[in-house]
Amino acid sequence: MAQMYLAVTIIALLAISHGVSAKRGCSAFGHSCFGGHGKRSGDTSAMDQLSNQDGVLMARHQLGQEETPPHPVYPHSGYNVLASGDDIIPIRDGGVYDREDGGAAREVMKMKLRNIFKHWMDNYRRSQQNPDDGYYIESL
C-alpha cells in the first residue's frame, strides 16, 4: 500500500511539474532578464484605471507583467519573439554576441585568461624567489 501511495505521489508531482519550465524564460518573450530581479508587479490599480479610461484593455499586456523594449542597436529589435535559430545574446557593454561570430569572442576570452594566469604565475614565482617577503601563518 505504501509503495502504491509513493508511486501515485511521484506521478502526480511529475505531472504537475511537467508544464513548469524556466529554460528559455524571458528570451521566449523577446526581452532579456539579467537575473536577480524577478517579475516586477507594481500597482495594478493604476493599470486598471488607464485601461478603463480608454475603455479597451491592452491585448498584449497582462496584469503584473511588464514588457521591456529591446535595445535599439540589436539586429532584431522587434517586439515579437525571435525566430528559431536566432541566437543573440546581449552582453554587458551593450553590444551583441552572435554565436556565428564566436571566434573573436573566444580569442578575447583566451587573452583575458592568459593575462590572469600569467599574473598568478608571476606572483607565485616571485614568492618562491623571495621567501622572506611573504606572509606566514603561524600555528596557534
Curated annotation (Swiss-Prot):
It is found in: Secreted. GO terms for biological process: neuropeptide signaling pathway. Residues 41-140 form a propeptide. Disulfide bonds join 26-33. Its main location: secreted. GO terms for cellular component: extracellular region. The keyword Iron does not apply. Residues 1-22 form the signal peptide. Keywords: Amidation, Cleavage on pair of basic residues, Disulfide bond, Neuropeptide, Secreted, Signal. The keyword Secreted applies. Expressed in corpora cardiaca (CC), corpora allata (CA), antennal lobe (AL) and gnathal ganglion (GNG) (at protein level). Expression detected in few animals (at protein level). The modification Histidine amide is found at residue 37. Transmembrane segments: none annotated. Ligand for the CCHamide-2 receptor CCHa2-R. This is Neuropeptide CCHamide-2. It comes from Agrotis ipsilon.
